[in-house]
């Protein structure tokens, strides 16, 4: 299974989700991350995301931001959006209904149908990154439990 994690800039939430899933992945799965905007293309994850990942025994230093592309619909089986704005932006790019059906809100993995958001911690302090990490870990654990 190939999974893509998507947030706005691909420097805060999706790199954390990418790192968490990568650390827990079954061997035959792969994961990547992207952003719906290209503002930070080629940059490393936000230092606060890197710090939060390290606190939890995960390295995300090797990741580089990239922008979501239409070709990602072909390359991935599941595309997780961090919030409804990114969800809408991704679905809008879908070439067909089958592609659009690959897009999910990640928090629906633990709160089905509630469409809860993973807040963007970019403008806040380190505690926001800790909260986001915990949310993502719970959602990813639920996804793995149902799909392995």
Where are these regions (language model features)?
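Helix N-cap/beta->alpha junction signal
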Residues: 14, 83-84
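Generic detector of well-ordered secondary structure
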Residues: 23, 33, 55, 82, ...
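Conserved active-site segments centered on acidic
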Residues: 1-75, 145-148
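Phosphate-binding/catalytic loops
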Residues: 78, 84-148
């Amino acid at each position: 299974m190939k999974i893509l994690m998507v947030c706005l800039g691909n420097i805060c939430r999706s790199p954390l989700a990418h790192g968490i899933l990568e650390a827990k992945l079954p061997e035959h799965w792969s994961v990547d991350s992207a952003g719906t905007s290209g503002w930070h293309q080629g940059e490393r994850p936000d230092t606060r995301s890197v710090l939060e990942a390290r606190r939890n025994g995960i390295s995300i230093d090797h990741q580089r931001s990239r922008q979501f592309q239409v070709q990602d619909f072909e390359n991935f089986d599941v595309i997780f959006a961090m919030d409804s704005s990114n969800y809408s932006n991704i679905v809008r790019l879908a070439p067909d209904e089958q592609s659009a059906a690959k897009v999910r809100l990640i928090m629906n993995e633990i709160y089905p149908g509630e469409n809860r958001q993973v807040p963007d911690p970019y403008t806040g302090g380190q505690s926001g990154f800790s909260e986001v990490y915990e949310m993502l870990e719970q959602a990813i654990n639920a996804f793995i439990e149902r799909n392995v």
